Amino acid sequence: MRDLVIRRCEPQDYEAVHRVYSSPDAMAGTIGVPFSSAQEVREELSRERDGSFPLVACVDGEVVGQLTLSVYMNPRTRHSGHFGIAVRDDWQGRGVGTALMEACLDLADNWLNLSRLDLRVYVDNAPAIALYEKFGFDIEGTHKRFAYRNGEYVDAHVMARLR
């Protein structure tokens, strides 16, 4: 792969992140609604939140993926976090998700001391499930009819990694 860099998401990245989430396959894997505007993405990413760490994956300076790690801020759950990830359709299966996951887990383990990370993933997203399992995530349960996507309800697994 060419030069792949994971770094903090900056305001100049917002348009490119919008393009990531505008990719049909990337969008289908999220709980977002298609056709979100660049302004909506900009507002979401620019909202400063305690415990939120937005990252981007760049290949030769071009944003091709995005991950946001968020710490649960309740005093009783601050040992836990969750994340969402998306990779542009034309970069899926090329190591971008793996690199984002490695950066996420480094941040969670070595800087934030999180002992639990969890996520939701649609049950039909086999490549994502395989990626998460590769990093030690296990399925803890399934939310039935979790989201409405493309005219039908879909289930989602809750996956978590404990350390």
Report each predicted region and the residues it spans.
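Acetyl-CoA-dependent GNAT
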Residues: 8-11, 30-90, 101-103, 107, ...
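Terminal substrate-recognition subdomain of acyl/acetyltransferases
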Residues: 152-163
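Helix-loop element at the rim of GNAT/NAT acetyltransferase active sites that forms part
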Residues: 19-33
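A short beta-loop-alpha structural element at the N-terminal edge
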Residues: 4-19
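Conserved active-site alpha-helix within GNAT-family acetyltransferase domains
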Residues: 94, 98-99, 110, 123-141
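Conserved GNAT acetyl-CoA-binding A-motif
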Residues: 109-120
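Conserved catalytic-core motifs of GNAT/GCN5-like acyltransferases
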Residues: 118-121, 133, 138-154
